[in-house]
Amino acid sequence: MDKKLYPRIGEEVIWETLDNGLPVCIVPKQGFSRKYALFATRYGGMDMRFRLNGQWLDTPAGIAHYLEHKLFENEDSDVFELYAATGADGNAMTGFEDTIYLFTCTENYAESLKILLDFVQDPYFTQENVDKEQGIIGQEIKMTMDLPNRKCFFNLLGALYAAHPVRNDIAGTVESIAQITPELLYRCYYAFYNLHNMALAVAGNLDVDEVIAICDEHLKPCEDMNLEVKFPEEPSLPVKPLVEEHFSVGVPIFSIGFKCAPYADDVIVKKEVEANILLSLLAGKMSPLYK
């Protein structure tokens, strides 16, 4: 168990890699009433082409988000009902690079953590429930098409990238999700929902040994997968310098993007901070442009 102290901010972070390969991050918060847990996998909206055990598979846009939705529906229960019984507030989110399942609570933390670990490891996909979800997510996609901020953001990505799947909406399109089948969901699940490709983070006034014991009891051992994700070749320059679209909004919305080569992991955080400072200076609430 690796403990790191941050005296300047009064924090302690505990790291432990379990025998099953899952890295666990624990942040003790003495005196806090609310507790948190996040169970995440490195699988997001742009991971559309991957190779597992030598076989390449191309998947439709939106399948990672679709899979996130379907995991909440088990064969004999609804996960939100299980959380309601413990008083926990559960949720999930799919990003470009990851999918995160989380809950917060003030009591019954151990029971809620068991629910989280169990349902994420228990996929249940049938043709009937997959077809039902297509209608639900299809309506969600149609609703987001009318959101100016979201539309502006993905117009920017479409102007920057010619082929990289980051240009696609994480939820996909009505047409792309119609291609999703139970078999395809299972293949994506067993490729990416592997404990060696996942992480657990917990925080709050909790018992560290109890958290580790629950993980050891409820996590299923698995072998590391020979998984490779591939992205298409991308030109260095943007596709278009400008994209305009008219919406009925009171205040114009704009986004600016800079296309650059990928940074190493240890540089990304620094570059993000630099970019946020620069953007605040250029277009923040105290900037001449905003005023």
Residue ranges and their predicted role:
Residues 1-79, 186-290:
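His/Glu-rich zincin catalytic helix
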Residues 75-188, 209, 289-291:
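Acidic/histidine-enriched segments that form metal/cofactor-coordinating
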